[in-house]
Amino acid sequence: ITLNSDTNRGVADDVVVEFLGVPVFYTPHHEWVLEGRGSGFLAPTFGRYSESDPSDINDSRLGDYKVRIPYYFNIAPDRDFLLTLNQLSSRGSVVEGKYRQLIANNKYLDKGRFEVEGHYLNEDDITNNKRWLLNSSIDLSINDKTELSLVTNRVSDKDYFKEIAHSDTSATALHSHIDLTYADEAQDLNMAVFAETEQLINSGSASYLRAPEVSISKVFEGMNDRKMDLSLVSTKFTHKEGNTTTKKTGLRTHLQANFTRPITTNAYSLTPKLNLSSTDYALDNTTNESRSIYSFGLDSKLFLEREASLFGTDLIQTLTPRLAYNY
């Protein structure tokens, strides 16, 4: 065994692992990192599968095998890359890669994280088609109030997970989205823009999409604890069955408004509340719909106190009856 602190590597030749004096493992050469992490091969994995039903790992007819050999690249403290060769006996060689990076504070961004993963099979030995997977994820804190999230998930065809990855065979869709949010706690203001798409897989049929959705909420506070809470959400939505629109699609706008004006004295408190909820549907190729709901509430309390004594100890006895009414 040789330990080299200058290269941060350990090397061992003719390694024999024994258990109770019995050799159980041998390797002619092995290297490892002394401190931290380093580049190198990771443990390979072996498995079997069946083309008749790739999702059934207990199928007694398992006649195909897969071997995954990963190599890890330690690029820098804030980034790395994993390269894997996935050999499928019935399909061919799949090259897989996964890159990760942390984004530190700079003049453009507060902080963030970036990740991208790709799989590629140049020619499927059975279908003669190119098969691929591409996933990415970006989370950015643009400043102390604004954040951005972007997620994409795509595959070459709906049977990729069943025939190539041999996983997620129960999933029916791959979702992708972009989400931009703004939150100002000092101003009680929140805004967001959201949009999503999806790819149907594994014979998936139903889908519901919001593309886009814009929301804003604001709290207004006045004198004597007056408060008005407003929330507005506008959503462009679609229902799809396969690639054909078969359900209602259109624009939904929802407005929520709450008004409160607490009145508090040493003897009592009254809190009237007025709520308004309105939803409007501007539907395509059909009659528009809308509904409005109004509600009123009154919450009242009495504060009753008196001096009392218990076993020679002076106490204050408090009784707070409460009556609430909602319509």
What residue spans do the PLM features occupy?
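Outer-membrane beta-barrel proteins and related beta-barrel translocases across Gram-negative bacteria
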Residues: 2-327
